[in-house]
Amino acid sequence: TPDTEVDTGNGIMNMYGSKMRDHNWHRGGYGKIDVTRILEVSSNVGVSYLIDKHYKDNPQKFVDGLKRMSIDQPLHLQIPGEGKPNIKGPKERYFAKTTLPWMSIGYETQVPPINILTFYNAIANNGVMVRPKFVKAAVKDGEVVKEYPTEVINPKICSDHTLTQIREILRKVVSQGLAKPAGSKQFSVSGKTGTAQISQGAAGYKSGRVNYLVSFCGYFPSEAPKYSCIVSIQKPGLPASGGLMAGSVFGKIAERVYAKDLRFDIRSAIDSTTNVIPPVKAGEMNEA
């Protein structure tokens, strides 16, 4: 549950001989925090501890849960070049005891950004996962010759109760967590940050040169979502922050899109003297 507490200690936890670290381990970690705060601050220790605690005796149950949400499904996009997601199971080679905790924070899996965006769009869309589309209709000589309807991949990725909880947490990630740069004063934003080392092929994560993938995926406005977006940035070396770097880009995109979309109903913008109030930003009619 969102209020379940985990002692993340000093930000370093031993996981089967390997060290799981939080981004602030050198500053002493976060100590005891609840699940909501774990996600707000992207605590690797908190997430991996919980997943390992509940699924270490049956990791297949964790993998099955991911697959029930269709996050591993090919999207069959309308354009070529689609990446294929890969989430391995405990029956496959190289599934060690460390695999589950590291999978829980995004390592040892391959999920293209468009698949992550599709998943977050489903959260915003009341749990209904739809296939991304780039073409709504084919037109020839002004006539529609073919339409491409919305296709549902998964009618319900989770229960309504779970959906309500995760949407509230994702809103707090932006309003009071590490993703504040993705927020806006004009409307509410929900989403999650991501910061990961990029594997260097055969050298894995231990080569001398370290590249990072920082990301933020979310939707807005939080209360009545209309847009979803993902920003992924590959950069060499530190510093690397999904919230600060990708989140800032997301915030600028969101404000630009929202500003273009704002349209006041002129009929409701007429005062007692029948003077028309000019269109302004949401919540700023008094400045007209």
Residue ranges, per PLM feature:
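Beta-lactam-recognizing serine transpeptidase/beta-lactamase-like catalytic domain environment
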Residues: 1-233
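Intrinsic structural disorder
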Residues: 38, 109, 207, 236, ...
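Short, well-ordered alpha-helical segments
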Residues: 60, 164, 244-252
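Short, gly/Ser/Thr-rich active-site loops of penicillin-recognizing serine hydrolases
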Residues: 144-151, 247-288
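Short alpha-helix boundary/capping segments
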Residues: 158, 209, 238-249
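Short beta-strands and strand-coil junctions in structured, solvent-facing domains, enriched
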Residues: 237-239, 259-260
